[in-house]
Amino acid sequence: MKEFFDALETCAPAEREAALMAALARHVAHAQAASPAMAGILAGVDAGTIASRAALARLPVTRKSELLARQQAARAAGGDVFGGFAAIVRGKAMRRAYASPGPIYEPEGTAANYWRTARALHAAGFRAGELVHNAFSYHMTPGAFIVEAGALALGCTVFPAGTGQTEQQLQAIAELRPDGYLGTPSFLRILVEKAQEAGADVRSLRKALVSGEACPPSLRDWLGERGIQAYQTYATADCGLIAYETAAREGLVLDEGVIVEIVRPGTGDPVAEGEVGEVVVTVLNPDYPLVRFGTGDLSAVLPGACPTGRTNTRIRGWLGRADQTAKVRGMFVHPGQVAEVLKRFPEVARARLVVSGAMANDRMTWRVEAAPAPGLAERFAEAVRDVTKLRGEVELVAPGSLPNDGKVIEDARSYQ
């Protein structure tokens, strides 16, 4: 059995980086030429100079909220439903269009393995000639189609089970005897538990590719005890495959078709290796050429290489959401404001705003990592008032003492 999907998975890291950076400059030029929205976002950028991670980090981050706002504005004006982000139009070049919550509309091009999920399926043990039970939703959103495209590219046959109708799904599994499952881990557990209650035979399921929600080790072990090896994948409707789990069970390996950065929430500034931050993705997809797309998800880079021999960077997986906006005394405070305050104090390593107290009696405390210095707390408090229009206490703490969890705003209020 072939262990790796292709030679890219084991190429030298320097070789991969050189290829990605060469592709990056071409991708930026294509985005400017083919995507009106990206052309506006990247106005004045010389694509030929965007050939390094440092250069990429100087470009603006486009977050999901901005993508939605641009689509809504375009639709209100009777324009492009995709808000100018798509580089393809209806017809032969666009196989399907989808609606994700918002709604945000996404196009699907015609390339085989369009979402690049065949790589994740291969790492999870799926192979040509197998039957897969796809329990992701086939209704409006692209979830089911994202993994189906990868399964078909591998040479698998797909049963489009969709969601719900547990009894009918159990009957189909018992009679069709699929080799593997695609869907959320929680629904797989429901199927297995219902099968045990009903005496249905689901023993043909030996592997699973799960996504859409967290799959804690306890659930993975529970499934393993019942003969199902479950592997996580990190994919979105905007980006396709971002990262996937391997047999090593040590984080998720990045896909070969994306450039991933981990940035401080609310900014576009890359964090140090190992520090938790927002996942920002540049998707090398000519049909939907996103550059520095902010997913809103938190993760961190894992040091070292995957024990399986795959040489691409690994991340820790999904660690929560980066959108930490809090409403304090009737005013919104967001991560971008925290970043703006920090920029005024180069001597401050990190800071966290902790909002505590009961509802209608909010208390703001800024925990600031810095060496003691005369007047620093007072100057920091003044900057906070200037940026947020709110008063708060400032507490200086030792460098490195704040948790490495990606949070810059912590809502610790009681909502009882």
Write out the residue ranges for each language-model feature.
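Nucleotide 5′-phosphate-binding alpha/beta core
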Residues: 1-99, 103-123, 127-128, 360-365, ...
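Active-site glycine/GP-rich loop and adjacent strand/helix microenvironment
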Residues: 1-30, 154-416
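Short, glycine/charge-rich beta-strand/loop segments that flank catalytic centers
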Residues: 56-58, 131-140, 151, 165-169, ...
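Hydrophobic alpha-helical segments that mediate membrane insertion or helix-helix packing
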Residues: 100-101, 132, 151, 260
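Short, composition-biased local secondary-structure segments
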Residues: 110-124, 140, 186-197
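A glycine- and small-aliphatic-rich helix-loop capping segment at beta-alpha/alpha-beta transitions
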Residues: 115-116, 150-151, 250
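Conserved AMP-binding loop of ANL adenylate-forming enzymes
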Residues: 122-158
